[in-house]
Amino acid sequence: MPEKKGSADAKVLHCSFCNKSQHEVRKLIAGPSVFICDECIDLCNDIIREEAQATARAAIRSELPTPVEIKSFLDQYVIGQTGPKRMLAVAVYNHYKRIRHGEIKGDEVELSKSNIMLIGPTGSGKTLLAQTLARMLNVPFVMADATTLTEAGYVGEDVENIIQKLLQNCNYDVEKAQRAIIYIDEIDKISRKSDNPSITRDVSGEGVQQALLKLIEGTVASVPPQGGRKHPNQDFVQVDTTNILFIVGGAFDGLEKVIRDRTEKSGIGFSAAVRAKSERGVGELFGEAEPEDLIKFGLIPELVGRLPVVATLDELDEAALVQILTEPKNALIKQFQKLFAMESAELDIRPDALHAIARKALQRKTGARGLRSILESALLDTMYDLPTAGNIRRVVVDANVIEGDGKPLLIYADEVAGSDESAQGEVRDAAA
């Protein structure tokens, strides 16, 4: 019974669930003929939270895709880069297999984490590979820019801000965050400025590498709740980074020179062997990168050691850029055709225009990243007029449009209708 009478004939209310009286709890909330105390409410919240976390864990533990399936998924969105995709597929599969292994108690063999370093020119697909992996595995993903990071105590973001951003993406679900993928771009920009010690402090170089080292190898990071600032008298959210997969990427401009100096060493003086300078491309040289080259470039040995999987991406040529424009599921040409279709117009980009776009991107040295801006610029006037013109049914783009020597050919609705009628007339004449 929710109500009981005391000695003074006063009604004492009781919780309908645990039967504690109103004097034994802090708060008793009344409903239609029932009462619930604050302790029972807390217990219910804990049960709901545990069930939600168990559901999230079950989703993570669901059938893990094989390396072949991972690469096949990457092939749908990323053109070329077969070698790096195979390396990524194996590394990611082993990483999440390692997490499962860690959940088995009583096994003496402890598997170490295989974080990944992607080396490749600008616009070669480093960021896209990391994003696509996270989407396939249905795990939280956060991207950070290494150039904005500084040592703790200096103006700028410290490395724990990355974990804070990750928690925000996960709605502060710590269990989910601890199995995420973190991609740190421009890692080459925090290399040591020189091998010589300096009286000035390198707050965005070696110091940041040292701070990242702890995070990458696995530590318990303390993050202020709900994105607040750190101050001594507050509770922190504890996030263990041991099972977070870190992928770092960078263009590493100048690394090819370090590799060339190592691989093409020759003596000096009259007795030195005379060898012609090889004409190997940047991508080919990157493929020969060794840990010693990365250390000489400016990364600290400890950080290089924590990134055992090094995948080097090839420089994209004209043919690869044309494929990127047309073949992936979310190819740029398909995106623009969908935009034009929303205005009841068909966008026809001729093959010579595709090659012109690719050549322009190569000249600008922007890789795949520069393709959109070239296409946006070429179609700007057409997209400006299209919504108000109303009767444009087809837009044809050739190489002259891309090179700035012409304008897109616009075909209007009445022209389409006229051509259809003339075609029908020709059919009737032929039949007669």
Swiss-Prot record:
Pfam families membership: AAA_2, ClpB_D2-small, zf-C4_ClpX
UniProt KW keywords: ATP-binding, Chaperone, Metal-binding, Nucleotide-binding, Zinc
Segment forming the signal sequence: none
Database matches in CDD domains: RecA-like_ClpX
List of residues binding Zn(2+): 15, 18, 37, 40
GO molecular function annotations of the record: ATP binding; ATP hydrolysis activity; ATP-dependent protein folding chaperone; protein dimerization activity; unfolded protein binding; zinc ion binding
SUPFAM superfamilies: Glucocorticoid receptor-like (DNA-binding domain), P-loop containing nucleoside triphosphate hydrolases
Domain ClpX-type ZB, residue spans: 3-56
Gene3D superfamilies in UniProt: 1.10.8.60, ClpX chaperone, C4-type zinc finger domain (6.20.220.10), P-loop containing nucleotide triphosphate hydrolases (3.40.50.300)
GO biological processes: cell division; proteolysis involved in protein catabolic process
Matching SMART domains: AAA, ClpB_D2-small, zf-C4_ClpX
Binding site for ATP: 121-128
A GO CC annotation given for this chain: HslUV protease complex
PANTHER family: ATP-DEPENDENT CLP PROTEASE ATP-BINDING SUBUNIT CLPX-LIKE, MITOCHONDRIAL, ATP-DEPENDENT CLP PROTEASE ATP-BINDING SUBUNIT CLPX-LIKE, MITOCHONDRIAL-RELATED
Functional note: ATP-dependent specificity component of the Clp protease. It directs the protease to specific substrates. Can perform chaperone functions in the absence of ClpP.
Family listed: Belongs to the ClpX chaperone family.
Assembly notes: Component of the ClpX-ClpP complex. Forms a hexameric ring that, in the presence of ATP, binds to fourteen ClpP subunits assembled into a disk-like structure with a central cavity, resembling the structure of eukaryotic proteasomes.
Protein name: ATP-dependent Clp protease ATP-binding subunit ClpX
Organism encoding this protein: Bordetella avium (strain 197N)
Gene behind the chain: clpX
